[in-house]
């Protein structure tokens, strides 16, 4: 089965490909020109569905993609000491179009401004699957703590400041195999794969 990803984020593409080896995973940007998708829902699930529906709508106008399956992910980090921020704004926390590094340093600065050296936090991943006849969504979570510093250079996004529950290293310091077993996206994808195998 061809699984078309409604993302061109290299980090997400790499992680999803590694976790979905049973499928031919193709970022939509390899099939058509990238276009802006306005993510204006108030939840991760809502934004994942917006992305999947938008890519499905454009691609379904071409005969060769009529029976495709589109998968979209919306994910982010919620920090307790910041009242759950950045939440659904994780990808644009520093500003619209901000880089991973800019978002990371903005979050570190905001945690420091709160007077804390760290805080309980969690990642959420919502995955939406859109086909010709159905829409599905699943979630995965990873709990832990953020620290107000960068440790490690692996992963992407906020990984260098997030220490998963039960570990003493950040996601930026952990190896890929360990992360595959504990990440919010891996948990959501394991549920998504159950759905995909029935299609």
From Swiss-Prot:
Entry GO terms, CC: cytosol
Instruction: Report the SUPFAM superfamilies cross-referenced here.
Output: ITPase-like (SSF52972)
Report the catalytic activity. XTP + H2O = XMP + diphosphate + H(+); dITP + H2O = dIMP + diphosphate + H(+); ITP + H2O = IMP + diphosphate + H(+)
One Pfam annotation, family name? Ham1p_like
For this chain's record, the cofactor binding note is: Binds 1 Mg(2+) ion per subunit.
**Keywords in UniProt for this one?**
Hydrolase, Magnesium, Metal-binding, Nucleotide metabolism, Nucleotide-binding
Keyword DNA damage listed: no
Q: Which E.C. number(s) belong to this protein?
A: 3.6.1.66
Biological process GO terms, please? nucleotide metabolic process; purine nucleoside triphosphate catabolic process
Q: What does this protein do?
A: Pyrophosphatase that catalyzes the hydrolysis of nucleoside triphosphates to their monophosphate derivatives, with a high preference for the non-canonical purine nucleotides XTP (xanthosine triphosphate), dITP (deoxyinosine triphosphate) and ITP. Seems to function as a house-cleaning enzyme that removes non-canonical purine nucleotides from the nucleotide pool, thus preventing their incorporation into DNA/RNA and avoiding chromosomal lesions.
Know the name of this protein? dITP/XTP pyrophosphatase
């Amino acid at each position: 089965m061809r699984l078309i990803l409604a993302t061109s984020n290299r980090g997400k593409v790499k992680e999803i490909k590694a976790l979905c080896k049973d499928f031919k995973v193709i970022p939509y940007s390899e099939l058509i020109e990238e276009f802006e998708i306005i993510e204006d829902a108030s939840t991760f699930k809502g934004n994942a569905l917006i992305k999947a529906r938008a890519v499905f709508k454009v691609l379904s106008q071409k005969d060769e993609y009529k029976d495709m399956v589109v998968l979209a992910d919306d994910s982010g980090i919620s920090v307790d000491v910041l009242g759950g921020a950045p939440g659904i704004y994780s990808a644009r926390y520093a500003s619209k179009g901000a880089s991973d590094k800019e978002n990371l340093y903005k979050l570190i600065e905001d945690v420091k401004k709160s007077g804390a050296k760290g805080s309980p936090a969690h990642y959420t991943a919502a995955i939406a699957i859109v086909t010709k006849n159905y829409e599905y969504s699943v979630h995965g979570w990873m709990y832990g703590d953020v620290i107000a510093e960068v440790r490690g250079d692996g992963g992407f996004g906020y990984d260098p400041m997030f220490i998963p529950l039960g570990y003493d290293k950040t996601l930026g310091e952990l190896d890929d195999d360990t992360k595959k077993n504990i990440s919010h996206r891996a948990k959501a994808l394991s549920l998504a794969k159950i759905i995909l195998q029935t299609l």
